[in-house]
A protein has these predicted regions:
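Conserved adenine-nucleotide phosphate-binding loops and their immediately adjacent elements
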Residues: 1-22, 90
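Substrate-engagement module of ASCE P-loop NTPases
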Residues: 138-147
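P-loop NTPase Walker A phosphate-binding motif
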Residues: 30-61, 78
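Structural recognition of the conserved hydrophobic beta-strand(s) that form the central parallel beta-sheet
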Residues: 118-122, 147-154
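Short regulatory helix/loop adjacent to the ATP-binding pocket of P-loop NTPases
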Residues: 155-168
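Conserved NTP-binding/hydrolysis module of P-loop NTPases
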Residues: 70-90, 104-108
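Short acidic, S/G/P-rich loop/turn micro-motifs used as interaction or catalytic elements
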Residues: 39, 66-67, 124-128, 157
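Conserved P-loop NTPase "ATPase switch" module shared by AAA+ and STAND
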Residues: 107-132
C-alpha cells in the first residue's frame, strides 16, 4: 500500500484554537492578541475561509502598515472598495468625535443586512494613535448584528473601561 502524500501547504488549526475562534460570529468585536509569529493572521484567515465555504459573507481585510493615520485611512478606503463598498471614498479621515460618529452612523447603515460582514484589521499594534482604538470601540458599540470586527495585534490596545463595556 503506498504511503499517503503529505501536503505541506495544509494549515492545522487545533481544536482548542477553533473553539477560541467560534464566538467571533456572535461578537461585535474580537481582539486576537499574541506575539509576532504566533499565527494570529493565519488563524483569522482560516476562520474566515471556513465560514466563506458555508455561507455568503462580506470580508473586508485591512492591513496596517505604519502609525501614519492618513496611510491607514487610505488602506481602509481601498479595503472597503475591494469588498464592493465604495461609499468610503467620499469620506475624509475623521479627526474628531463628531466626524467619527458620523462615519460610524454611515458604516452601520451601509453594512446592515442579512449577510454576515467581517472587518479584519491586521497588525493594529503599528497604529499608535489612541483615537483609532477609541473609534473601534465606538463602532463596536453600535454595529448591526450582522457585522463583526476582528482586530489582530501584538499588544492589548483597548482601554480597560471599554473592554468591560464591550463584555470582555
Amino acid at each position: 500500500m503506498p504511503k499517503p502524500k503529505w501536503n505541506l501547504n495544509t494549515i492545522y488549526i487545533s481544536e482548542r484554537l477553533q473553539e477560541s475562534l467560534r464566538p467571533i460570529s456572535r461578537c461585535a468585536m474580537t481582539t486576537v492578541v499574541a506575539p509576532m509569529g504566533y499565527g494570529k493572521t493565519t488563524a483569522v484567515n482560516w476562520y474566515l475561509g471556513e465560514h466563506a465555504k458555508t455561507e455568503t459573507l462580506h470580508i473586508i481585510r485591512i492591513s496596517v502598515y505604519s502609525d501614519n493615520l492618513a496611510i491607514f485611512w487610505k488602506s481602509v478606503q481601498e479595503a472597503f472598495a475591494r469588498a464592493g463598498f465604495t461609499f468610503l471614498r467620499e469620506y475624509p479621515c475623521p479627526t474628531d468625535a463628531a466626524g467619527g460618529g458620523l462615519l460610524v452612523d454611515d458604516l452601520c447603515h451601509m453594512l446592515a443586512g442579512e449577510s454576515p460582514c467581517y472587518i479584519f484589521i491586521d497588525d493594529f499594534h503599528l497604529l499608535t494613535d489612541k483615537r483609532a482604538s477609541l473609534f473601534l470601540c465606538m463602532l463596536a458599540n453600535r454595529l448591526p448584528a450582522n457585522v463583526h470586527v476582528i482586530v489582530a495585534s501584538r499588544d492589548r490596545f483597548l482601554p480597560a473601561a471599554e473592554a468591560v463595556r464591550l463584555g470582555g
